Amino acid sequence: MNLILLGPPGAGKGTQAQRLERTRGMVQLSTGDMLRALVRSGSPLGQRADAIMKAGQLVPDEVMIEMISDRIEQPDCAKGFILDGFPRTVVQAEALDRMLAEKGLRLDHVIEMVVDDAALTERITGRFTCAKCGTGYHDTFKRPAQDGVCDVCGSTEFTRRADDNAETVGKRLEAYHRQTAPILPYYADRGVLKKVDGMADIAEVARQIEAIIAG
């Protein structure tokens, strides 16, 4: 089973990918993580990618495809993969399809985690964490029982991520919609695009994804 999970930062892609790794033995393939590992490997392809990135240029599609091709041939991908961060253009999507076809593989589903931008912004900007034990809270959805005191450890110190602000979240959402807009029709035309409610709770999103996979 080979999937692409689409969704903006904060939609819960990582949570669902980790669950699929745990329950189905699939492997999450983040192109960012793969590029860093490729550069560390010192292979000819890694050296080429490193030189390109150090020059401030985008890594060419053919390098990305070769990197993904090599990665999915590893034994841990035998039960399938979940691709994250690629493709972002129709040209990349077409190249990915060709590469998979040459291996006798295909994408079974492209799952879009659909979110409401305003609601997602509220979800992200309201997050805060106990500075001592790391327990997560939310201004609206999960406040401590006693204001200013952690339910778990009693600490009175809390932190917020610097980038969990409305301006930064808005820019992330804008970038996501701009990047994914071209490839949604491509996968819809091929009958593999499915949608789940990314604003539902984690268990419900998982149920919807499992229903898609079960077919």
UniProtKB/Swiss-Prot annotation:
Q: Which example biological process does GO assign this protein?
A: AMP salvage
List keywords of the entry alphabetically: ATP-binding, Cytoplasm, Kinase, Metal-binding, Nucleotide biosynthesis, Nucleotide-binding, Transferase, Zinc
- Write down the Pfam families for this protein, in alphabetical order: ADK, ADK_lid
Q: Which residues bind AMP?
A: 31, 36, 57-59, 85-88, 92, 161, 172
Q: Which GO terms describe its molecular function?
A: adenylate kinase activity; ATP binding; zinc ion binding
UniProt pathway annotation = Purine metabolism; AMP biosynthesis via salvage pathway; AMP from ADP: step 1/1
Binding, ATP = 10-15, 127, 200
Quote the EC number: 2.7.4.3
Primary localisation category: cytoplasm
For the region LID, what residue ranges are annotated? Answer: 126-164
PROSITE patterns, A to Z:
ADENYLATE_KINASE
**SUPFAM superfamilies given in the database record:** P-loop containing nucleoside triphosphate hydrolases (SSF52540)
Q: Fill in the subunit field for this protein.
A: Monomer.
The protein's name in its UniProt record: Adenylate kinase
